[in-house]
Amino acid sequence: MIVHAHNNDFMQKGKKALFYKFMHYRNKKKVKQYATDYFACSELAGEFFFEDEVRQSPHYHIINNAIDSKRFKFDSEMRNIYRRDLHLENKITIINTARFNYQKNLLFLIDIFDELKNKDDRFELVLVGDGELRGELEQKISDLNLTDSVQLLGLRSDIPELLSAADIFLFPSRFEGFGISLLEAQASGLLSFTSKTVVPESVGITDLLTYISLDESPVEWAEMIYSQFTSRDIDRNKYTDIIKEKGFDIDTEAKRLKSYLDD
């Protein structure tokens, strides 16, 4: 039996979290009684889920969260079509693809976007997803008078095309087991920003990704984002090859997983 670790913190907060922490501590000690192999999507996820004894055993493996990298290759034709359809021409487009929940920290993202908008009125925000915090998110957008600059697209199946249409990927999560959305963004050649220490360093496989501490203010996040965006010239076409070379393409990782299972 394989047990797989996919996150590095609890989704539940408040009183519920106490129960989940107790059960997590209890089951962390018991899991080795039942499992034959232990997989994790990152070292952070493995440290959260498994005891040291498990992580030092030959049956413990990091299995890369992989993507079909060719699907996410930057497409200039789709970029032009989507920017026209979404009225993003002449805009600096920030995108986030995530569930609207506590983990993804989207209220903080709105604060960062507000600071960027103060720097340059061309900024536009596209949020792809849905979730329990949608109402709070809409209220905050309204309170900051950002309604005309933020598009909530809901759940979509055309993520690769939307990434091609964007200029910046912003992902200030409170915690992540890996952060596969960041991998997709890098495959599309998007300048990307995420949270330091709570998002695994293993997802930063290109020079596109910058980590910023959540202890920094929205002003400081905005300064870093704006500085990089205005000073870098990026060839977005080359990054799918880098994803493959680093072992994060689905075909490569599927073969590696099969070799473990065949042993």
Identify the residue ranges that each predicted region occupies.
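A short helix/loop element that forms part of the nucleotide-sugar donor recognition site in Leloir-type
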Residues: 73-87
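A short, active-site helix/loop in glycosyltransferases that binds the activated sugar's phosphate group
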Residues: 32-72
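Nucleotide-activated donor-binding/catalytic signature segment of Leloir-type glycosyltransferases, i.e.
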Residues: 138-154
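A charged, aromatic-enriched C-terminal amphipathic alpha-helix characteristic of glycosyltransferases
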Residues: 233-263
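Aromatic "clamp/platform" in nucleotide-sugar-dependent glycosyltransferases that forms part
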Residues: 155, 174
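A conserved mid-protein helix/loop that constitutes part of the nucleotide-sugar donor-binding site
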Residues: 92-115, 132-138
